[in-house]
A protein has these predicted regions:
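Interfacial loop-to-helix transition and helix-capping segments at the boundaries
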Residues: 22-34, 101-115, 158-184, 219-252
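Transmembrane alpha-helical segments and their boundary/interface "anchor" motifs
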Residues: 26-35, 46-82, 91-108, 119, ...
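Alpha-helical transmembrane segments of multi-pass membrane proteins
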Residues: 1-11, 78-87, 151-157, 220-222, ...
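Membrane-interface helix-boundary motifs at transmembrane edges
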Residues: 49-61, 127-139, 193-206, 259-273
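Perimembrane loop-to-helix junctions flanking transmembrane segments
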Residues: 11-23
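Transmembrane alpha-helical segments
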Residues: 37-44, 122, 126-129, 184-195, ...
Length: 294
């Protein structure tokens, strides 16, 4: 929610230092979409870990109820109740209404819904890759490196032709196809296969993760401030290699925080159990003592 709010604030007459603070905050939270994609795929693979394939009937039934239908309903609401929010033109007949509906041009933020729904559709394929990798480090390297090459090659192509290129207007729909977030979805699924090893690594080398996060944050912030106008947030895109690396750093940091929370809560629960047992033993001792007296 902060991203559109900050974008709105930057249209107000703030001085340079205030704009710098808002842009830095915007850059700080520019990770949410990759992190959500990672978390969604991680969760689906975790829940279906004991099955060779996704139970397609129940899986797609659940996804329709939880994701597809709400997305379609909100899109319809935006087009009918708030038509002024449309992007890339406005509908003026049935054909253009259908186009605006399915291209998710109804509002600026619906591009992410299209992205998420695509990953839900290709989830059986991601599950197949995770099953193929299983717990093989060699296959893991093959999957990680090959998908990384495809992904960063795509980012270079996107940057050259669309983000800062001649086809920004004509090829704008390419900002919402799944390949633009490929590694976040695939790495999310593969992370479950190796979650014990990842947890051990992150908990052991937490200082490295924190340092990596800080380095990538200040690097992406400096790159943006040195290259673009402060108020031109459209160029602070997910589809830059530096932002992709930053998103991965944030995902690792969130993963680390979750592990730390789990360990902390386990200690709290153990301490609570100890206090409970101590209370029981104290009551038993007091009862025995009173019986002995009387």
């Amino acid at each position: 929610m902060l991203q559109p709010i900050i974008t709105l604030f930057l249209t107000l007459p703030f001085d340079h230092s205030q704009q710098l603070f808002l842009v830095s905050l915007y850059n700080l939270v520019k990770f949410t979409s990759p992190a959500f994609i990672f978390g969604i795929v991680f969760t689906v693979i975790r829940k279906n870990d004991q099955q060779a394939k996704l139970p397609l009937k129940s899986y797609f039934s659940d996804q329709w109820d939880n994701n597809f239908f709400p997305t379609f309903a909100w899109t319809l609401f935006y087009l009918i109740a708030m038509p002024n929010l449309q992007q890339h033109g406005h509908f003026h007949n049935i054909a253009t209404f259908i186009w605006q509906f399915f291209s998710d041009n109804a509002t600026p933020h619906l591009w992410y819904s299209v992205m998420m729904l695509q990953f839900l559709l290709i989830m059986p394929g991601i599950k197949s890759v995770c099953n193929w990798v299983q717990h093989s480090y060699r296959r893991l390297l093959i999957a990680v490196i090959s998908s990384g090459i495809i992904y960063f090659a795509w980012l270079i192509f996107y940057d050259h032709f669309i983000l800062n290129g001649p086809e920004a207007t004509h090829w704008y729909l390419l900002d919402r196809i799944f390949i633009s977030f490929l590694i976040f979805g695939l790495y999310g699924g593969l992370s479950w296969n190796f979650h014990h090893e990842i947890q051990t690594f992150l908990f052991t080398y937490w200082w490295l993760i924190v340092g990596f996060y800080l380095l990538t944050y200040f690097r992406t912030r400096d790159l943006f401030l040195a290259t673009f106008k402060l108020t031109d947030l459209a160029n602070d895109s997910y589809y830059l290699p530096s932002m992709a690396i930053y998103a991965l750093a944030v995902i690792l940091l969130i993963y680390l925080i979750c592990i730390a929370q789990k360990v902390f809560m386990a200690k709290i629960n153990s301490f609570s159990s100890f206090l409970c047992l101590s209370s029981i033993f104290s009551q038993c001792f007091l009862g025995s003592y009173l019986l002995a007296i009387f």
